[in-house]
């Protein structure tokens, strides 16, 4: 199975983004029958979707997993739904801060992920890795990209796709007292297990 794994460039003054740290380390590897390609996306409204579409054309994946940073979350969060709404709390890396703007004007209000969400969470929890189903990907570039991905693929595509938020790395969280973090090795193992489930689980739950 060909899998496209994406992460984002750092934003909001951070020097690293754990989503790209994970995706880049899994690139060009074969994991449980999955061949992984990785692409780094800009943390920029509009440009992230354009770059993702180019990557889809280049790699022709059978599954797509977009990763993003969710500072403050303590678990790997498997996103259930992408909303057709940009609601930025902070500016992106080009200074854009859209509020109450649709990602795709005239398109459906939401799309559901086509990953086996419950099976993924169950697998991670069984391995002792904190995981949860999330019903909001926020209003920043992560949700924007997630919605753009699902809209581009459409409902009839055989390509399964979704979005996963991961916590800060410890070196990031130390700057924010009380914020949760997750060791890179743990997050890496968690995303490897996501790929294992993708390969073996055909249901979307």
From Swiss-Prot:
Keyword tRNA processing set for record: no
InterPro entries assigned to the protein according to its UniProt record, in alphabetical order: Peptidase_C15, Peptidase_C15-like, Peptidase_C15-like_sf, PGP-I_bact-type, PGPEP1_Cys_AS, PGPEP1_Glu_AS
Recorded GO CC terms: cytosol
Pfam families: Peptidase_C15 (PF01470)
The keyword Hydrolase belongs to this UniProt entry's keyword annotation: yes
Positions of the catalytic residues: 79, 142, 165
Broad class of the protein's primary localization: cytoplasm
SUPFAM superfamilies tied to this protein: Pyrrolidone carboxyl peptidase (pyroglutamate aminopeptidase)
Any GO BP: proteolysis
EC number: 3.4.19.3
Reactions catalysed: Release of an N-terminal pyroglutamyl group from a polypeptide, the second amino acid generally not being Pro
Single GO molecular function: pyroglutamyl-peptidase activity
CDD domains reported for this sequence: Peptidase_C15
UniProt keyword terms in alphabetical order: Cytoplasm, Hydrolase, Protease, Thiol protease
Protein localization: Cytoplasm
Family indicated by similarity: Belongs to the peptidase C15 family.
Job description of the protein: Removes 5-oxoproline from various penultimate amino acid residues except L-proline.
Subunit-structure text: Homotetramer.
Protein name as catalogued: Pyrrolidone-carboxylate peptidase
């Amino acid at each position: 199975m060909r899998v496209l794994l994406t992460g984002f460039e750092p934003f909001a003054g951070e020097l690293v983004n754990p989503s790209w740290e994970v995706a880049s380390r899994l690139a060009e590897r074969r994991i449980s029958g999955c061949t992984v390609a990785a692409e780094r996306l800009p943390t920029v409204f509009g440009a992230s979707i354009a770059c993702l579409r180019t990557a889809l054309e280049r790699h022709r994946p059978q599954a797509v997993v977009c990763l993003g940073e969710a500072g403050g979350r303590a678990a790997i969060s498997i996103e259930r739904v992408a909303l057709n709404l940009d609601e930025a709390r902070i500016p992106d890396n080009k200074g854009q801060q859209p509020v109450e703007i649709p990602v795709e004007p005239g398109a459906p209000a939401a799309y559901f992920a086509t990953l086996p969400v419950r099976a993924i969470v169950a697998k991670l929890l069984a391995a002792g890795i904190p995981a949860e189903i999330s019903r909001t990907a926020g209003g920043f570039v992560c949700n924007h990209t997630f919605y753009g991905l699902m809209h581009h693929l459409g409902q009839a595509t055989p390509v399964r796709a979704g979005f996963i938020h991961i916590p800060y790395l410890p070196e990031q969280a130390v700057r924010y007292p009380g914020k949760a973090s997750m060791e890179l090795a743990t997050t890496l193992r968690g995303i490897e297990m996501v790929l294992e489930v993708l390969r073996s689980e055909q249901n979307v739950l």
